[in-house]
Amino acid sequence: MPGVPREVIEHRLAVRPGARPVRQKLRRPAPERQAFIREEVARLLEAGFIREVIHPEWLANPVVVPKANGKLRMCIDYTDLNKACPKDPYPLPRIDQIVDSTAGCDLLCFLDAYSGYHQIRMAREDEEKTAFITPIGTYCYTTMPFGLKNAGPTFQRTTRISLGSQIGRNVEAYVDDLVVKTRNQETLLLDLAETFENLRSARIKLNPDKCVFGVPAGKLLGFLVSARGIEANPEKIRAIERMRPPASLGMCNASLAVWPP
């Protein structure tokens, strides 16, 4: 996948001068998770997102975590590398303002970037700092991996560069969460055409299976939004309704700790 051109943006690691590289020792996860790591490494190699590396100074371990849908995801434990990098001060938008801005929009389009972070390349001189160790070898990322301290601000910069003329007008973006907001059906296609043209210019690809177009309501950053504003999320309501009533004073106190007055 070609991804965003380097001249537009690439992810750099501003490692503090004098920071000592850390090489984590190989961890041995359960056999089924080792098998999943092997599959992920093969997939990432084929996609060109990682490459083999020899004698890296920094070395981290992969971690397998469950996703909301029950499937597994391989992340890298960049705790040590992240400690050596100062926080990027680039501002992220306020979630409440993004959510509130969708009120009054009759139709919404929710867009999902295909392998979002991997569409941004790592700076070549920083690739080997992302190295990780597995039972079958050591690898580093050629694209921006999930888990790096400042990956979010870098992606926010990317959306600001590509959609800057639209943000606040007919598009809102929080890192890789994008929503096209349309006041009425007559302008829907115009708003989408403008968005697609800008994304195409930046070579940002979308995942059509995860995009939703022209709907009156949908989930955005954990909220259910519509033309009326924020609405109660049915999934969260069901979770509360399914809770067992407290059967002891201790359980009552625990409930009060979760929902303080």
Where in the sequence are the language-model features?
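Retroelement reverse transcriptase polymerase core
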Residues: 1-261
